């Protein structure tokens, strides 16, 4: 059974994992605000990295001030993953256990493969472990 209540999801997994949940991908309304909340730098170079990566996923209309709610569900999932990947590299994070809850299921097969390749590169250099949750079971995928 999938967990759809954020409180239940965090109660169950947040002590062990960084949780990226499809139903709660962002806490602000634009990429610029999201990056500012995470880095507290105006117009961080991280923004350009995210937008460039978004173009590689054919999200050509991505912009720093576009309301995140105007993207499709799959586009939001991709942007959240790209933001997470960029932060891992930027902050030199190692040893993280990342739980993608209903995130990979929301993107096309092609984009899922591309995202997993991006994660694979980061996982190998930053000792990151990647997990998914399905039917109440955690499965390590990388």
Model-identified regions with their sequence ranges:
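Conserved ATPase "switch" residues in P-loop NTPase domains
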Residues: 120-124
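Conserved ABC ATPase "signature" region
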Residues: 47-63
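Conserved ABC ATPase signature
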Residues: 67-75
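Walker B catalytic motif
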Residues: 67, 95-111
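ABC ATPase nucleotide-binding domain signature region
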Residues: 1-40, 135-142
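Conserved hydrophobic alpha-helix in the ABC-type ATPase nucleotide-binding domain
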Residues: 111-119
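Loop/turn-to-beta-strand initiation segments
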Residues: 94-97, 125-131
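GG-anchored amphipathic helix commonly corresponding to the ABC/SMC/Rad50 NBD signature/C-loop
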Residues: 74-99
């Amino acid at each position: 059974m999938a967990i759809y209540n954020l409180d239940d999801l965090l109660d169950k997994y947040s002590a062990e994992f960084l949780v990226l949940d499809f139903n709660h991908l962002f806490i602000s309304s634009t990429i610029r605000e999201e990056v500012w909340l995470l880095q507290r730098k105006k117009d961080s170079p991280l923004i350009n990295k995210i937008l460039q990566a978004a173009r590689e996923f054919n999200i050509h209309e991505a912009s720093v001030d576009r309301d995140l709610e105007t993207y499709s569900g799959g586009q939001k999932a991709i942007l959240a993953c790209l933001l997470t990947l960029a932060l891992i590299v930027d902050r030199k994070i190692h040893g993280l256990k990342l739980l993608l809850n209903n995130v990979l299921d929301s993107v096309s097969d092609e984009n899922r493969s591309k995202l997993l390749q991006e994660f694979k590169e980061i996982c190998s250099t930053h000792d990151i472990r990647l997990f998914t949750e399905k039917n109440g079971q955690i499965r390590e995928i990388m």
